[in-house]
Amino acid sequence: MPEPSSKPVLVTCGLPYANGKAHIGHLRTYVPADIYARSLRKEGRDVTFVCGSDTHGTPIVVNAEELGITPKELVEVYHKHFDETFKQLGVYFDAFGTTDDPENHNRTLDIVNRLIEKGYVYPKTIEIAYCPKCNRFLPDRYVEGSCPHCGEIARGDECDQGCGKHLEPGELLNPVCTICGGPAEYRQQEHFFFKLSEFSDYLMDYLSNDLGGTINARNYALGWVKQGLTDWCITRNLEWGVKFPGHDDLVVYVWVDAPIGYIAFTEEWAAKAGDSWEKFWKNDGEIVHFIGGDITYHHCIFWPAMLKGADYSVPTAVVASGMVKIEDKKFSKSRGNVVWVGEDYLSHGFHPDLLRYYLASYTSHTKELNFSWRVLQEKINTELVSVLGNFLYRTMLFAFKNYGEVPSGELEPEVREEIEKALKEVKAAMAEYEFKKAVDSAMSLASFGNTYFQSHEPWNLIKQDKAACGQVLYNCLHLAKALCLIFEPVTPGSMETAWKELGQEGDLHTTLYADALVPLKAGTKLAKPKILFTKLEDDRIEEMEEIANQRVKAADAKKAAGKGNGKEPTKAEGMGPAEEAKPAEKAGGAAKPREEEKETLPMIEYEDFAKLDIRVGKVLLAEPVKKSKKLIRIEVDIGEEKTRQLVAGLSSYYAPEELVGKSVIVLANLKPAKLCGVKSNGMMLAADDGGEIVSALMPDKEIKPGSRIR
């Protein structure tokens, strides 16, 4: 493989929008970027890793109005939240600023003025959505209507629910004010445009020949350029944001000042580190952007055109991730299909390294990632626990008990070759942003270690020849050292623990990959090892699944009650993975949902209902399920020769003895499922109000078991 570049490299992440909490979808960008930056450092590269909160745009103004606070107060809360969450997950930026920092205001004005001076920005009178009732112009998120391209419901600047195209002010059909729900009209006003169309030829060449990264980003962007580019309105009618030069009534569009944040945050880092930001943005340093796939257009078209026009360096690579599903369902906060990083994962005591491993090893970075608590359990138990953790613990415990230090020995050629092979494969995979391949290669080395340990049977060898056993343990401990270095980018906290137990000097996080082949020093004192990874038990996973189920039920109940808008969450104007903006509400009170937006389930044919075997059952026995705080095992008579065993999550609402003798409603032909190891042959039906009330369904008259519901 070619020698790595000696150029300094800047790694950035799409900015999280300071308008809501961190969820699993966010981490598809930030964790792989952190892994990549750590890996580059282990190759000896000069790496700077920056990010920050995206703090401007209409969604923040809307939400601040709803909460009765200023936009600045709102973003301060969420900026702190993201900063703390990233650190808890082991994601450490060299600078983590905000787009409202003075550095970003100054850099944005510098670039915009430069574009004006070079003739790339011009004024144009256009039609802007205006609400006569609210007496205000309606930029972006303040207006909704029909997309002129596909007819789907869209917001003012993007068809986020349909074709995904960027929309210019005035393009939206049948505009409606999202503040009051009334019809909007178009009025003329002067705004400013960037001559994006003049960069078509440049972008075609840049995307085809110069831009690295993932092929999905390049191909999407090339497709848009081939369709033809139109000039881009870069001003908005807002008070919150970076003021457009010479026009205090206008701010620059959030997609202008947000990516410029990359430069501003580099400046902030340089000022603290006594280094140069220009080595990236004015010279030939490498710039690698990690983004969610839904913001490819902005990073591969708008952004490089602006940079080229203002005489700044353009990105070297854009790495776009695939989307995220939750339990095989489309990610949707409004539908409850979401996993919150804080309240769902970290607050329940799950180690950050487990989630980092899952995100890196589940699938290729460009493919869709499904987050499932069961798959998490399987991957952690069968891979981290049974392979990597097993090898490290058994090796270090045996060595500690029998030697107390690194025994004398030499690195065997076979072991050296396996380490060299793993290093080569990991570096190559990282260079291609194939994090799963890198993890698979690293795990193969751990598997080799287990095989090596097992085949030499040190527990027998030590009884016959302690020196020969020491040679085996020396090689096992050297493999452990190599694994600490190779896995550090993925599971940094756990590997740091193992590194210290091996008695290694120096900071694991700054030690290079090359050190994996430096011989261990015999006589180095070992510490008693800890179990690095423990199995995720069924009851913990079932608890999380129940939390997820209750969230979905609550969302369904909210919509059924007419409190939801029935729409998929929209991509906020920020740069991070999809953020849902709250429906606009009039200051001082909640807006009433429009009737046409209430969601109902689709109509079904009678034949669909007839497929359900729903019967009355009599509860004969009910008892708690061991290892679960929520489940009850129920024996029920439903008119068959034998009783049915059901498992119901009702412990929080009924004592088992309360159910005995009751007539209940049972779905009898539901496929069997195991819960906490207990088989459930059907489902006992219950109702909930989306809050704290849950009620088992029971007939109001005595009726024999087995009676069918028709």
From Swiss-Prot:
Cofactor(s) in the UniProt record: Zn(2+)
UniProt subcellular location: Cytoplasm
EC number: 6.1.1.10
Residues involved in Zn(2+) binding: C147, C150, C159, C163
A single Gene Ontology CC term: aminoacyl-tRNA synthetase multienzyme complex
Disulfide bond annotation, renumbered to this chain: none
Motif interval(s): 'HIGH' region: 16-26
Binding site for ATP: K333
Cofactor: binding comment: Binds 1 zinc ion per subunit.
GO terms (BP aspect): methionyl-tRNA aminoacylation
Catalyses which reaction(s): tRNA(Met) + L-methionine + ATP = L-methionyl-tRNA(Met) + AMP + diphosphate
Membrane-crossing residue ranges in chain numbering: none
PROSITE patterns reported in the protein's UniProt record: TRBD
Stretches for region Disordered: 558-598
Bias type Basic and acidic residues, positions: 558-571
Subunit structure: Homodimer.
Function statement: Is required not only for elongation of protein synthesis but also for the initiation of all mRNA translation through initiator tRNA(fMet) aminoacylation.
Protein name: Methionine--tRNA ligase
Gene name for this UniProt entry: metG
